[in-house]
Amino acid sequence: MPNLEIIFSSDECDIFYNTNLHIVQTFWKGVYVNDEPFRRILDEIINALELKKASIIIADAREMYVISPNDQEWILNSWYPRAVKAGFRYQGLILNKDTFSELAVKTISNQYDSSTVTTQYFNSPSDALEWVKEIQEAGAEK
């Protein structure tokens, strides 16, 4: 059973530190958010990476709404570089069944330099956490 330490909570998203796996986990709650409130949440993810010295994020985005084009651009040009500087190297994305949301998330991830951040897509949290264990067993997470 994972031991999740709450790092940040809002109406839109919860951010946890998984003390068993030494990863940051996010759970989007199905409340539409964009612009500054959305960016503040993503900045809290960077804070969690820095605080816990983690390199892996598992984002449960099944309840996430479409990301606006302005926010997509901000993620690519501002958030990703700062997250990488904070130690971000791997992301597992548990995707929404909404085709538009899935497309937006994959578009952003595929545009960022894959030599810096490794991305995998999953249908379930258990599959994503198994992937984390494989990375850690291979000694690749640092």
Segment roles from a protein language model:
Residues 1-142:
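Amphipathic, Lys/Arg-enriched alpha-helical "gate/interface" segment within cytosolic domains
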